[in-house]
Structures are given as C-alpha cells and as structure tokens.
C-alpha cells in the first residue's frame, strides 16, 4: 500500500505543479498588468485634478468668450489630424512609464478648456507615448471616470440637498444610467474610429466650426 500511496502523492504533486505553471500567466496579469494599469490612472488623475481646480475660474471665464472655444476647436482639429498620422505603437500597461501617465494627465487637465476635445486630446497624447490604438482608447476612457467624478464632487458641494425633491433624485439616477450607456457606445465607436484612422473627418468638422466661431466673435 505504501508504494501506491507514494505514487498517488507524486501524481498529485505533479498535477499541482502543472496547474501552478498554467495559472502563472493569469496570476501575472492580475498582480502586475492590472495593478500597473490602476497606478497609471491614479498618476494621470493627479495633474488633471490640480489643473482642474486651479483653472476652474479661468475655464468659466473662457466659456463666456466665443473666441476661446473657436481657437480650441482649431487646436482639436490639429490634434485629431496628428492622431491619424502617428505610427501604431506597441506599448501595453507594462511598457508605459509613470512619466507618460503624468503627461497624459496634464493633457486631460488642459482639455477642460472649452472647445478642446478631452477624448481627442488624451488619445493623441496616449498614441504619442507609443500605446497601441486599442489601449489608448481604453486608457483615455477609464482615466476620464475619476476626472468626471472629481468634477461632480466640486460642483455638488454647491447643491442644497434639502431643496432636492424625489423627482430630482430620480432624474439624477436616470441621467447617470443614460450617461453610462452612452459612454459604453462611445468607447466602442471610438475604437473603430481610431483603428481605422478616421479622425480626419472630425478634424475637418472641428476646423470649420472653429473658424465659424472665430468669425462670429469678430463679426459680433
């Protein structure tokens, strides 16, 4: 019986080793790539938050002047045009540096200016660091979540909750759900646009609208 038990124990040990080896790539992804991805987003969020808070009054003032959105729309047009012409990169979360993430966060903070496309600005920044097009779109989308939540917290402190009615709360909930669905559709659409390099179409549109805005400012 001892040889049988010894053989059985040996088989179990071998199977455990096989399972551990097969499971290793998954464990590496969970403990390394995902963790690095989260850290990159956190690093990107820091400069975005600082710029967003520091430039809040400046952005509010810029929204009142038609010239500023016009200029920013033209800048967006240039960025989108560049994005289509950046060579495909191969960087995954592991290859992206924290310096890259910080600079991308700065670009998102600057994109709070009216007329600057947040997605266009951050995706162009991501592509310029060498990210794959798929990763650039996903990273741009994910990093927007803490930025949007942060902006919501800043704005919500001025809301008088005592004055809110149940209907208002329901509207906020419905609005949040709709925004989530629209966001999901947008990221799917953006993946197709970026992969097929169709940003030039939006670039032309932004250029035209920017020129119209600037013309309207001087005409008025």
Describe the residue ranges of each PLM region:
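Single conserved hydrophobic/aromatic residue that forms the stacking wall/gate
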Residues: 1-16
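Interfacial loop-to-transmembrane junctions
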Residues: 183-208
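Hydrophobic alpha-helical transmembrane segments in multi-pass integral membrane proteins
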Residues: 49-53, 109-117, 150, 211-220
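Transmembrane helix exit motif
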Residues: 14-21, 53-57, 74-92, 153, ...
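Membrane-interface helix termini and inter-helical loops of multi-pass transporters
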Residues: 55-64, 157-168, 193
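Interfacial segments of multi-pass membrane proteins
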Residues: 104, 121-143
């Amino acid at each position: 019986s001892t040889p049988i038990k010894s053989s059985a124990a040996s088989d179990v040990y071998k199977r455990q080793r096989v399972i551990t080896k097969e499971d290793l790539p998954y464990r590496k992804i969970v403990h390394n790539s995902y963790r690095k991805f989260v850290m990159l987003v956190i690093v990107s969020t820091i400069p975005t938050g600082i710029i967003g808070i520091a430039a809040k009054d400046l952005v509010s003032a810029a929204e009142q002047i038609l010239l500023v959105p016009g200029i920013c729309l033209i800048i967006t047009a240039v960025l989108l045009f560049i994005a289509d012409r950046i060579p495909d990169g191969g960087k995954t979360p592991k290859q992206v540096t924290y310096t890259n993430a910080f600079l991308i966060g700065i670009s998102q903070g600057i994109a709070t200016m009216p007329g600057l496309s947040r997605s266009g600005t951050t995706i162009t920044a991501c592509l310029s660091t060498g990210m794959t097009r798929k990763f650039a779109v996903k990273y741009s989308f994910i990093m927007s979540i803490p930025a949007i939540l942060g902006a919501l917290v800043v704005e919500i402190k001025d809301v008088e909750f005592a004055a809110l009615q149940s209907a208002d709360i329901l509207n906020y909930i419905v609005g949040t759900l709709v925004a989530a669905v629209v966001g999901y559709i947008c990221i799917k659409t953006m993946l197709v646009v970026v992969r097929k390099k169709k940003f030039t179409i939006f670039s032309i549109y932004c250029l035209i609208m920017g020129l119209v805005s600037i013309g309207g400012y001087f005409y008025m």
